[in-house]
Amino acid sequence: KSASIGVAAAGPSGRILVMVETHPGTAWVVPRLVKILAKREVLEVSLHPGSQASVLISDLVAESVEFVPLSTRAMGQACADFITWVNEKKRIAHVGQIELDAAVANAKTRFSSEAELWDRRDRNIDISPLVAASGAAHRWALLEDYDVMDSIG
């Protein structure tokens, strides 16, 4: 029913700041990403091709927007990270967006093999803001911890 773009950045006190933009449908997503990419320094665009986000791939390719495909395993890591960062480590900061607050309040998880994932099967509850925010925070943390010198022999 709706789609969300999640962004993550360095937040206050070493926390990860997450923000989302959510609108009905998916037609708006790629044009909005193109505008964001033109105006901001974006480290990466990522999506889970095993989800409804797969409908965006052809438009992303047509607009020459490079993206990182996230596996179900990576989405499980993002879910686990976000739960831990919110509940235990207090590592997430956000600006109090209604869509994200509602998604967090109503979200449930499920297991696929041994991975805990956000349960998106209930169409009456839109958790796309939470899925987008957790994916963005997970990828930000990985990129934040990456040292380019580690890849030089």
Please identify what each model-predicted range represents.
Residues 1-72, 76, 80, 84, ...:
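RNase H-like, metal-dependent nuclease domains and their acidic two-metal-ion catalytic environment used
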